[in-house]
């Protein structure tokens, strides 16, 4: 922990007092010999004292199952909420949680109940970039949900284009415009019709 504390202290020395320093941590690495929740409960106040303004709690570690860091459909919703809620009890700075928060009602509930101060969203915003606006407007049923399938987002990161030796462009199994926004501009039809979509295949 000494290295990260020194980094935080140096960052704080070199930025203004109102410049936010946000630290992302694993609430638990969930492997033998890895950082445990107990260790994070000990370290979190030290991070705060060193100058961190907000903690973002993830989980897992890359040496094991990648799907523990970026939970798939087989993992429960709110994979890291318990760890984040416990860490929140020992600090006086905002604590956000990340990791399969793919239901906006669930996200609102854990904030309203005071388990966390906020949620960080990634994949749900690929599925529906207007998610937050739709929720604010009371249009939850119009939200295109992330199903945590990994087919367009995480899987594409690890698919290498052999010509350029770079990751393939990001996409989303539920949002055909994701990563192709400049190519798939949706315009209003000249003639409006009522249509039915049969099947999802």
Task: Identify the meaning behind each predicted range.
Residues 1-200:
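Flavin-dependent oxidoreductase catalytic cores
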């Amino acid at each position: 922990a000494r290295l990260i504390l020194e980094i935080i202290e140096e960052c704080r020395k070199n930025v203004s007092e109102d410049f936010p320093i946000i630290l992302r941590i694993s609430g638990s690495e969930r492997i033998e010999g890895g950082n445990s929740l107990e260790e994070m409960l000990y370290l979190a106040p030290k991070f705060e004292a060193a100058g961190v303004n907000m903690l973002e709690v993830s989980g897992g570690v890359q040496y094991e199952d990648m799907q523990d860091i970026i939970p798939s459909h087989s993992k429960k919703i709110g994979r890291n909420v318990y760890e984040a809620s416990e860490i929140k009890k020992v600090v006086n700075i905002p604590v956000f949680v990340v990791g399969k928060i793919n239901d906006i009602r669930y996200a609102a509930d854990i904030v309203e109940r005071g388990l966390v101060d906020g949620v960080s969203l990634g994949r749900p915003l690929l599925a529906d970039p207007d998610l937050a606006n739709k929720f604010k407007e009371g249009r939850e049923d119009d939200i295109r949900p992330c199903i945590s399938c990994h087919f367009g987002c995480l899987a594409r990161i690890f698919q290498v284009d052999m010509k350029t030796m770079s990751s393939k462009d990001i996409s989303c199994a539920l949002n055909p415009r994701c990563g192709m926004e400049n190519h798939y501009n949706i315009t209003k039809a000249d003639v409006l019709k009522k249509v039915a979509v049969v099947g999802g295949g």
